[in-house]
């Protein structure tokens, strides 16, 4: 870059940073003073109105809104300060020169910053309509759309990018085509060093279209590993929060991901963009949050482990319960229950029948016959509550008379009545809960009945397996979707109307029924679905999911930015698919190496010593948790800093890690070492997809060890795509 251009940009940066510092100083002084005043006012109000009479209550009611207004103003100013402090660290990352009626230079950053007296904008928020021009892929004619939906044509004369630290200008790039390879790689340092970071400075044109898309309420984003699906989704969340800031907040958006560990891994992205983190969850946590489903269920990761070792009937059960055929059958079965066959429990208190299953059926099919199933059941609940109160009152009186006749109870009549009520309330509590929670409907019988009614030899075996699991009070993961859906349709659920948008990561691992259950839980939500059909951990039939969303756009990202060209080519060859277009750097080819078992620890230690440095990340992957634990026990004395990542892990850790391959999905590491790539271990139908996921975690270095015979999934890869070495 020519010196006079550099000097000019440095002067501009210095001026902007000085203005930012001035605003920050003013706000810090204001907030310090405001905080002190608020504390004093709260203490004064608390002291003065500690004893509220009617008259003083009126005074308190007039003071409270004023105090609340001051607190809201404090929160708002503090939010503005946080954004200015972000800008102070790196004021902007881009500049575009556009010609409308006149030539204008616009600087693009994480938030808007302007002159208060003139209203002139010094830094444009990257999410503003005009900032979309920065992410276009060419100079010349372009347009942007303003909120009134008016199209504004402009000429883009220059696109410039910066790397900035406080008031220091580190790098300048001029790009005719937005972020060419050289610029992209200068800006995209190895991100596998830490938690996921924002990609706002390196958003590509195809990614920008996804982030800003408003043509459909729902979107499915498909793409290979490293295409930025999750990163784009996080930027899309930030964009939606900006675009709809008057009606949408972080508490209205939910991200459903495979694990709490992954939620922690991405937890820095939105704060880096000046936004609060959204609501994070997992499918398993949604199940646990539902009332009236008391049985323990295995987690997603426990399910993966079980299926890796499962016999044929367990595998058939998983595929069958996740199939579209069963989903369609279950939906029809539930509709049929409106006419006949809904199973009820008889409710009793002690040995005395409170209401029989026969009477419940009479109420359901005769008295409330014209209503939806869940409304009928709520009518029955309302019908039973007066009877319950009457039974309790009679029981209390009987117990009171009993206590009066027993010498050991000493006390007056009030004491005896109080004791009677306490005992009866405790005795009737289970019955009260059963009525309140519609526990008189046999949900498990509905579920098992829907399986048995398929009337095939396969269904019969799966029915018997499911019965055994229910008796053991331990559900499989594949039971969660059907049971949550049945619960929602039959008993109804506490629907969350606050969530307006949901991002589901790894949608390829969700069944149709799981998705239907999520829709039931969050009826007001629109969806952004992220997936890659080749990264299947739990194979399900998922083609039906996008069909459930009437207004949906399906977008495919076909470029990978994560790994070197060599690793990306190797990854593509695992599944014998067309090469994924890699925009990564050039690097060393993957190493596929046979080692003797006796040398395994020495070889792994050598890899760690050669490839691991501070501010990089290295992971050792095995197929399952048992193998990881065994290897960890062998390595922990020779590599003291190694950390085993378990299924229960909730906090992402940096450094040298060891974890099962299925847990690595979504993460990226500078170096990946697959420690057990033998045919005897990876020989299942879906193991090639697991290996595809495992190799695609590496950004710079990929090493694969095997002991006897390399798995067929990797053996079929052409030899010029990797290096080999055999130890004698």
Show where each model-derived region lies.
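Conserved helicase motor core of SF1/SF2 NTP-dependent helicases
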Residues: 268, 272-276, 281-285, 292-300, ...
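A structural signal for short, well-ordered beta-strand segments and their strand-loop junctions
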Residues: 95-97, 161, 220, 232, ...
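Extended, charged low-complexity regulatory segments
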Residues: 1-200, 204, 208-209, 711-712, ...
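P-loop NTPase Walker
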Residues: 1-31, 35, 39, 46, ...
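Well-ordered alpha-helical segments embedded in enzymatic catalytic cores
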Residues: 202-209, 236, 329, 485, ...
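Alpha-helical nucleic-acid-binding subdomain
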Residues: 241-502, 509-517, 525
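Conserved phosphate/pyrophosphate-binding and hydrolysis machinery centered on Walker-type P-loop NTPases
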Residues: 189, 193, 370, 374-377, ...
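Phosphate/oxyanion-binding active-site loops and adjacent basic polyanion-contact surfaces
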Residues: 195-199, 229-233, 380, 384, ...
């Amino acid at each position: 870059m020519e010196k006079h251009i550099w000097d000019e940009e440095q002067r501009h940066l210095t001026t902007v940073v000085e203005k930012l510092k001035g605003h920050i100083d003013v706000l810090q002084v204001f907030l310090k003073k405001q905080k002190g005043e608020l504390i004093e006012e709260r203490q004064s109000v608390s002291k003065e109105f500690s004893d509220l009479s009617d008259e003083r209550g009126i005074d308190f009611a007039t003071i409270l809104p004023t105090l609340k207004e001051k607190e809201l103003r404090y929160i708002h100013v503090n939010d503005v300060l946080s954004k200015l402090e972000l800008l102070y660290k790196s004021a902007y990352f881009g500049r575009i020169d556009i010609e409308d009626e006149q030539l204008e230079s616009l600087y693009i950053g994480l938030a808007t910053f302007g002159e208060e007296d003139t209203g002139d904008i010094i830094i444009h928020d990257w999410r503003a309509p005009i900032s979309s021009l920065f992410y276009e892929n060419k100079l010349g004619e372009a347009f942007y759309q303003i909120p009134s939906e008016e199209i504004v044509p402009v000429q883009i004369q220059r696109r410039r990018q910066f790397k900035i630290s406080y008031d220091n200008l580190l790098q300048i790039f001029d790009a005719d085509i937005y972020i060419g390879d050289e610029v992209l790689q200068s800006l995209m340092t190895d991100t596998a060093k830490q938690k996921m970071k924002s990609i706002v400075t390196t958003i590509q044109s195809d990614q920008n279209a996804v982030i800003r898309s408003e043509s459909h309420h729902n979107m499915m984003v498909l793409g290979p590993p490293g295409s930025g699906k999750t990163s784009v989704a996080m930027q899309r969340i930030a964009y939606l929060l900006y675009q709809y800031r008057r009606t949408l907040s972080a508490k209205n958006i939910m991200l459903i991901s495979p694990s709490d560990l992954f939620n922690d891994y991405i937890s820095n992205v939105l704060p880096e963009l000046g936004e609060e983190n959204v609501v994070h969850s997992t499918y398993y946590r949604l199940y646990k949050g539902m009332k009236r489903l008391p049985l323990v269920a295995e987690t997603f990761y426990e399910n993966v482990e079980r299926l890796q070792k499962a016999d044929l009937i367990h595998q058939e059960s998983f595929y069958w319960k996740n199939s579209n055929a069963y989903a369609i059958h279950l939906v029809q079965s539930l509709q049929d229950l409106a006419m006949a066959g809904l199973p009820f429990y008889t409710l009793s208190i002690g040995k005395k029948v409170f209401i029989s299953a026969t009477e419940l059926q009479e109420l359901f099919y005769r008295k409330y016959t014209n209503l939806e199933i869940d409304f009928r059941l709520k009518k029955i609940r309302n019908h039973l509550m007066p009877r319950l109160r009457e039974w309790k009152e009679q029981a209390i009186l009987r117990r009171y008379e009993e206590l009066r006749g027993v010498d050991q109870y000493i006390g007056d009549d009030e004491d005896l009545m109080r004791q009677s009520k306490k005992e009866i309330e405790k005795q009737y509590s289970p019955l009260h809960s059963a009525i309140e929670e519609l526990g008189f409907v046999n949900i498990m019988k509905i579920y098992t009945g829907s399986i048995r009614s398929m009337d095939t030899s396969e269904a019969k075996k799966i029915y018997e397996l499911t019965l055994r699991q229910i008796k053991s009070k331990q559900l499989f993961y594949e039971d969660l979707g059907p049971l949550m859906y049945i619960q929602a349709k039959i008993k109804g659920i506490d629907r969350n109307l606050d969530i307006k948008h949901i991002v589901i990561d790894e949608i390829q691992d969700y069944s149709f029924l799981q998705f239907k259950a999520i829709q039931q839980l969050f009826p007001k939500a629109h969806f952004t679905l992220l997936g890659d059909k080749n990264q299947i951990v739990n194979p399900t039939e998922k083609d039906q999911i996008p069909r459930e969303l009437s207004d949906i756009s399906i977008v495919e990202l076909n470029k990978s930015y994560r790994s070197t060209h060599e690793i990306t080519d190797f990854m593509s060859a695992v599944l014998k698919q067309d090469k994924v277009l890699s925009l990564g750097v050039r690097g060393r080819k993957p190493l596929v190496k046979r080692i003797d078992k006796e040398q395994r620890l020495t070889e792994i230690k050598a890899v760690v010593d050669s490839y691991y440095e501070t501010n990089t990340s290295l992971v050792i992957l095995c197929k399952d948790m048992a193998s990881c634990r065994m290897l960890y026990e062998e390595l922990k004395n020779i590599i003291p800093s190694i950390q085993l990542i378990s299924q229960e892990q909730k906090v992402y850790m940096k450094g040298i890690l060891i974890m099962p391959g299925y847990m690595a999905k979504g993460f990226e590491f500078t170096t990946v070492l697959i420690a057990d790539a033998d045919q005897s271990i990876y020989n299942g139908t879906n193991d090639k997809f697991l290996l595809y996921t495992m190799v695609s975690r590496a950004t710079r270095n990929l090493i694969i060890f095997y002991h006897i015979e390399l798995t067929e999934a990797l053996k079929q890869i052409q030899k010029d795509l990797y290096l080999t070495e055999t130890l004698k």
